[in-house]
Structure formats: C-alpha cells, structure tokens
Amino acid sequence: SADGRYVSFDAPYTNLVTPATSGTQVFRKDLATGEVLLASSNVAGAQGNGTSASSSMSDDARYVAFHSAATNLVSPASSGMQVFRKELAAPYYFYFAEGYTGSGFQEYLCLGNASAASLTVKATYLYKDGTTKEETYNIPGNSRATVNVNLAAGADKEVSIKCESASPFIAERSMYFNYQGRWTGGHDAVGATSPSISWFFAEGYTGAGFDEYICVLNPGDLPANLTFRFQTQEEGEKTVPGFSVPAHSRASFKANQLLEDKSYQTSLKLESDHPVVAERPMYFSYSGTGGYGWTGGSCVMGAPILASSYYFAEGTTRAGFEEWLTIQNPGAADISVHAVYYLKEGAPVEKDYPVPAGRRSTILVNSGDGVGTEKDVSVLLTCTSPFLAERPMYFDYRGLGNWGWTGGHCVIGAASPASEWFFAEGYTGANFEEWLCIQNPGAAAATVTITYYPEGGGTPIVRTHAVGGNTRYTVPVNVDAGSNLAISAKVSSTVPVIVERPMYFNFQGKWTGGHDVVGYVP
C-alpha cells in the first residue's frame, strides 16, 4: 500500500488464515496488526478452487486484483484464467481510545459526510467495565452531524468509541475541559482506522506542570497484555511491562506514575499481544522559556508504524507562541534527521539533528536550533531510517480579537502529501476561530479548492485559493466560510499538499484553549 502498512502476495501455505486453505491463494497482510486476510475468496468467504496469483493492490489497500483459474469466485461461474478484484476493507471504521464525560469535561463526536448520499454510522461506546452501548446516527449528504457524547454515553463515564459505516465518512472526537479544576483547554483527534499491536508516540513529558496519560482501547475478544517502552531523552529506554486491558474495554495509564513520578522528556512505543488503539492526552501548565503559566491540554492518536518523512503544515514562532519538534528513534542505531523549514517569505532553512538510539531529541523552533522568532513556518523532516516526529505548540493566542486564550496543541506529522484532505470538525461561532494551514512542498503552484459542508445539509460552500510552490498558506475559516457555522471540510489540490486545521476558543465563555489535527486522507 502507499503507506507501507499492507502487502499482498500469493502463497501455497495452509496455515495463514482460518479455516485452512489449500493450493496457491492470494492474501493481504496488515504489517501493523499482523492480520492476514484471504483475497482469493468468493462473497461467502469460500476459497478459490483453483490457483490464484499475480496480485496487485490499490494505494489504500482496499482492493486486491489477481489472476485465478478458480471457477467459484463469482456467479455465474467463470472458466479458464480470469482477472478478479476483491474488496477487503468494508465497512469503514474509526476508533477512539480516549473519552471522559465526568465533571469538568465535555466530549463531542463529529461525523462528516462529503458524499451526496446520506449514510448511517453505528457508534459503539465501550466502557472500562467491559459493557457497551450502541447508537445509530443518520448523516445527510454533504453535511456533518455532532453528537454530545456526555448525553449519548452517559455522565461520569470513561468511554472509548468505535464508529462504523458501509459508506465512506470521517470521524473526529473533540473534548473541552477544566482539568481537576486547575487547567482549562481542549483537544481533538481523528479516529484510528484500525487497531494495531504497536503504537508510537514521539512527545511526552512527566516533569512539573505536566500530567501525561496513555488511553488504551481493546475492541477485541481477548485480553490485551501491554508493554510500555519509554525512550527518554535523559536515560534512554525504560521498559514497563505487566499491564493488561480486558476484552471490549478501555483503560487509562498515567505515564508520570509508570515512570515513578520522575521528570523525563520521553517518547513511547506501546506493544500489545493483541490489537488495540492508543491515544496520549496531556494536561499542563506550561512555563516554557518565560515562566508563562499557559494552561491547556493536547491529545494525539498514536502512529501504528514509523515512516522516513513527516510534514507539518502549521507552525509559528511569533510572540505568544512557542513551537517544538520532538523526534523519536526507537531503533538500535543512532540516526540523523534532516529538517527543511518552509517560511512564508524567503528561502527554506535546512538543519540536521542527531537522535541517539533508543532516545528522543527535542528542538525549540523559536531558537537558533530552528528558525528563530517571528516566523510562520512549515516543516519537512526526513531520515534514511524509520522514525517518528511530533510538533507540540504552546500559546497565548491573540487572534482576530486580541483574546489572550492560553493553551497548546500537538500533532504527529503527515507521512506524505496528498491531493485530498478531510476534516469532520469545524466551528466558526462566537468565541471560536478556525484556520486551515496548507503546506505546498513542491515547486509547482497549487490551486486549492475548499468545500465546506454545513451541519444538517444545505448547499456546500466552495472557495478556491492559490498556493505557491515551496510555501505555506493560511486560510481564516471564519472569514472564508463565514461565521456561526458548524462545518466539515474537504480540501482538494491540483498538486499534493499537506493540510492542518488549528482551532482556538473560549468554550462556553469559560474554558480557553486550542486544538489541531492533520487532515484525514482516505
């Protein structure tokens, strides 16, 4: 597949799937979860009764094409050697490990539908005691829907969510909070499309003023045994085994406690003997370089696999913002990561950063190690070896109204550019400011079309923007789409780009903060 996660192949082995196969068949393997599916089968799941080989796969791994002499794959029966296409990834799924509806927390589920036809999404709420609850939501064509999870899942619940539909959609989960009555803010995540036996996180801090958690959802039928491998900047790898999450359940683990309440700048590789989903919420009072006391929170969905490149469309080192890069090297050899900073004006700036084996490195982009202050910047990080990178940012956001909203947000970079990006969440009402940050890493100029889908349906709002080559471009959505809108968005480009959606807010006039996500690519 395009992201390197899936591989298709033919093999004569009998023990790759259950029930056992015979003869040469075509399979697809998920390298993140280890799951193997039989592609050379009919609609009832029966294996082909003849030799199947010469497979190829679509970029998203949804379709596998192959030659086969089997006569029972379609109806009416075929004869001789024929070409077949098998669809393997239906329905569509999004998973969320984090979720809490207790005092001081408000959780929402945003469901976006960028097609003209209506669709139905089934949401399964999974609680820490192993019980579940199912709800069904109808999403009109060219629209989005917002679910109040506090009402749907019930009050005072630690809850994960599994969303599924027979049609393409996108799901995000936004949360707003007054954490322990001390720190206000919000965070947001795009759901994971499948569980995995490994999850990577580049960012993490257990020092003063920071509370870090790892939330784990086990949607499977067997208990999941976990091993936490923290790659600390200070002391290398620290392994913490011996934890488990029951089937159809979720659990939260405080990283500060797992690391004996010591102060570490740390990355994490989470390992499980059965596929799970993992997120990392963090809550903080950020002192930074100036003793600021900016309170807030952030949350990222982990990465199931590593990559050799990461793109970050958003970034600024202007007054009131501090931007960092955290780089994880879980491998056994030292690596060097090359950074290209794309500025709003001027030539790109290039730097190189060493990352020792089994550790993580941290770069303050505002400093001379990055690009310095008063810059709007996108970043490309590359390495010859697989690694992971995140970009935490902390702020006293002034925005369009000189607000003074403090908080932070964090994302894992996009592994590659794309021609289409989707966002389920978006709001331009009072006390919310939404932006789209577009990074064009190529030399050719891009014509970017943004289609906004209002909640409840209606005519989509379409806007077009020109984005020059090797530049970063920012769209103020409150101006571009208009005010007082709950919207999803599709961003299409004539050349591949990267898109993020930062949002800043004063939720209900009492909880200030911000959150950001990299868009979803089908």
Set out the residue ranges of the language-model regions.
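Gly/Pro-rich, tryptophan- and cysteine-flecked surface segments typical
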Residues: A89-P522
